[in-house]
Amino acid sequence: MKINPDIFREYDIRGIYPENFNKEAAYQIGRVFADYTKVKNVLIGRDMRLSSPEILKGLSQGLIEQGVDVFDAGLVPIDFVYSMVPKNNFNAGIMITASHNPKEYNGLKMILWQRKPWIEPISGKLIKNLIDKKIKPAKKKGKIKKINLWKKYLSHIFSFVDLKKIKPLKIVVDAGNGLAGKVIPLIAKKIPCRIIPLFFKLDGNFPNHSPNPFEKGAMDKLIKKVVKERADFGVFFDGDTDRIVLVDEKGEPLFGDLQLLLLAKKFLKEHPKSAIVYKVDQSRAVKEFIEKMGGKPIRTKVGYFYTAKAMRENKAILGGETSCHFAFKDNFYADSGFIAFLIFLEIISQSNKKLSELVKEFKIYSKIHIPAIKVKNKEKVIEFLKRKYKNGKIDQLDGLTVEYNNWWFNLRPSNTEPVIRLTIEAKTNKLLKEKLSELKKLIKNL
């Protein structure tokens, strides 16, 4: 079978099932993964997507034929695989998931552990370059075994907080029919909070809303429920739970910048002068407040792969993204929605303030992110704007960033679509609207 090359991405593998990612593709990828990594065992977890059992069969078969022992963890969140691989001395881990993509998709996220303080993500593009290699089956086949590591996993995530410091808050949790519906009830047994559940039944059809919090309308039901119940705050988890979005008591989503600063304030108080990783598309406030709090801000490209790399290189204690991924040094430099959730619980409990009051100090700029602007020629747009705004401070760490004293923008081309992503921020809402209109006109006229 010839595999569609478009499914191999920088950080993972994702495609529509069964057209371009299916049992046969998973089988081939399993064989290539085994041949390349030379691992002896792999921990595999999967999300609740309807195609995940079939993908598991193909993937496991490919690994076993190459002599790899497969340990099937069952339906688990992605941070379960990230943390339980090193915690239990597995050589590697694979999560069957398409994260926040629509129900038609499925995919794989792959990691290695080489007895270091971190896990190593395996690029989908690396697998792509090896997919046509002829591989001889191993003389001795591997075995498959089911394994239950839930007790160890829960012990690990609870180790990030002092449960005695968590107060009886009222929280609306939107699991979106994803894995949070399985994990939050287990967490709830250990905390004094009242959890109001939304869409906890696991369902790969995602019948209630998109698993992507940035999709229009995805958070509407959560926002309404938080206000109606007069809850302390609300929480949205995406499908595989590696992203978490908080909603304050007024029904306003906080997203990545404000959430990262909440975490940074706590971490820098406990670990002064530590490095914290942030992204090129995050608010200028992130850098400024990390410095103000005595930390060392490390700016890097968008994407989990780059977060993990920058954290390792700078021994950062924390990393975050606009997309609401939060990675922790003590979680093997990997992200976890549930560790973030527990830490937010402790922060809010100990503050004796409403969530909206906690983040008020960080709201010093106006910002807009436009995830997709269709263009004919991405490179032409970037080169034109680079010339147009040549009197600003320019850098091209990730796309094009141009900074002025009272406003800035970042433009990043998509790797797979004819679109560009625009982030723009200004000191005032009026200036933001002016500059956004200016940029849109320039891009449209090209």
Give residue ranges: language-model regions.
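Glycine-rich phosphate-binding loop
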Residues: 91-99, 103-105, 226-248, 253, ...
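An N-terminal, well-structured beta->alpha segment
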Residues: 1-67, 146-170
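Gly/Ser/Thr-enriched, mixed-charge loops and adjacent short helices
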Residues: 106-229
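Phosphate-binding and adjacent anionic-ligand microenvironments
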Residues: 269-446
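Short glycine-rich phosphate-binding loop at a beta-alpha junction
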Residues: 41-47, 71, 170-172, 274-280, ...
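N-terminal small/polar loop signature for handling phosphorylated ligands or for N-terminal nucleophile
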Residues: 42-106, 187-247
